[in-house]
Amino acid sequence: MLNNPIIQQVLLEILGDDINGFNVLEALTELTEVTDDEISRQLDLKLNTVRKLLYKLYDARLVDYNREKDEETNWYSYTWRATFTKLPGVVKKRMEQLLIDLKEQLEVEENTLFFYCPRCEFKYSFDEAIDYGFRCSQCNGVLKEYNNKNDILMIKNQIKIIEEELALNPLFS
């Protein structure tokens, strides 16, 4: 399941583009239940890094834990495990949100006149361009009208791909 490119993309978003998160997930898959300390040693990662990744995965409901108190030290020990049964739902929800965001972006692109700075390549809406006197806020260069037809086509293509994936992929049935 972790080899699916859509799942990988969603996991990267969840993990903040930290590729070590995949290693943590693989360790959880291989070892079933494991402590953060064991993951840290196995992957040669700082314990703090492993914990941050586990918390991100926990917030996304992709891992779960048990907490046990050591009676001698009064410290808590956490045993983590992957909960991949929730992964398709998490991915589907994120894809549906992405679809909503893309449709909103498409609406803006189709209904707004844009300008850009040829030097900085910053893009401005018509209202922003007026506010700046048709000058770039970064380099003071003269703004030119921006043809966003390619942007619109790209967004429409992304929407089509996501809609098809949601409709056809058995993972999301």
UniProtKB/Swiss-Prot annotation:
Name recorded for this polypeptide: Transcription factor E
GO biological process terms, semicolon-separated: regulation of DNA-templated transcription; transcription initiation at RNA polymerase II promoter
Molecular functions (GO terms): DNA binding
Span of domain HTH TFE/IIEalpha-type: 3-88
Top-level lineage group: Archaea
Function per UniProt: Transcription factor that plays a role in the activation of archaeal genes transcribed by RNA polymerase. Facilitates transcription initiation by enhancing TATA-box recognition by TATA-box-binding protein (Tbp), and transcription factor B (Tfb) and RNA polymerase recruitment. Not absolutely required for transcription in vitro, but particularly important in cases where Tbp or Tfb function is not optimal. It dynamically alters the nucleic acid-binding properties of RNA polymerases by stabilizing the initiation complex and destabilizing elongation complexes.
Coiled coil regions in record: none
